[in-house]
């Protein structure tokens, strides 16, 4: 069909009581698996890329690929800037046709976070681009940004309302105990905090760091207002481990078209499970 923005997609999720998964892609194979699986399950999905991914693949190349695959599979897709921090970088990609942005200024003091985010919102809304921002900060690593667990902090529900009203954002990423990367042990999510945030903020809420969360935890966050679930590390790990296993078992393999099939199969299992956990099958 066409490349769309996240605003209507997440508003539909909020009304319908499900979440839309955002999968961070890193190469053609990741994109193929996400789109093919989503189309077969008739599920809305978001194609997310960090600054590193856009640098690796090229903005114009990614835009062309997403557009072509949306038409090929007759399936609405979103291409989303994940954890972008620089205004000029965001502006350039918006002018190239991107319609969904996450401006991450969560490392800044509250007032500066508002100022930085509002600048991006004011620009993006001129182009009908939806904007997500984060209040609170997750531990772990995303691209080249490393946040020590000791420096991570949770979203303040009262501040969340002020932040949403002052910036004009379309969705809010919250920090309730998740982290980027995989978990050494199951995280203790602060569900009461999430419920409180929901009472103060009527925007679609976003959960980053969902790789490795249990089905039960994911579905509980959705009941409490999460409308977008971000998954990155789980896909990378599935791809990498399957590829390592295949090449160990088949050291003579030299054709990427052959040995990448095992990696795609492993990722397909992850994507289908996340879609099922989010309750969005049949919602596209």
From Swiss-Prot:
SUPFAM superfamilies: Aldolase (SSF51569). GO terms for molecular function: tagatose-bisphosphate aldolase activity; zinc ion binding. The keyword Zinc applies. Its EC number is 4.1.2.40. Dihydroxyacetone phosphate binds at residues 181, 209-211, 230-233. Pathway: Carbohydrate metabolism; D-tagatose 6-phosphate degradation; D-glyceraldehyde 3-phosphate and glycerone phosphate from D-tagatose 6-phosphate: step 2/2. Zn(2+) binds at residues 83, 180, 208. One of its GO terms (cellular component) is cytosol. Catalytic subunit of the tagatose-1,6-bisphosphate aldolase GatYZ, which catalyzes the reversible aldol condensation of dihydroxyacetone phosphate (DHAP or glycerone-phosphate) with glyceraldehyde 3-phosphate (G3P) to produce tagatose 1,6-bisphosphate (TBP). Requires GatZ subunit for full activity and stability. Is involved in the catabolism of galactitol. This is D-tagatose-1,6-bisphosphate aldolase subunit GatY. The gene is gatY.
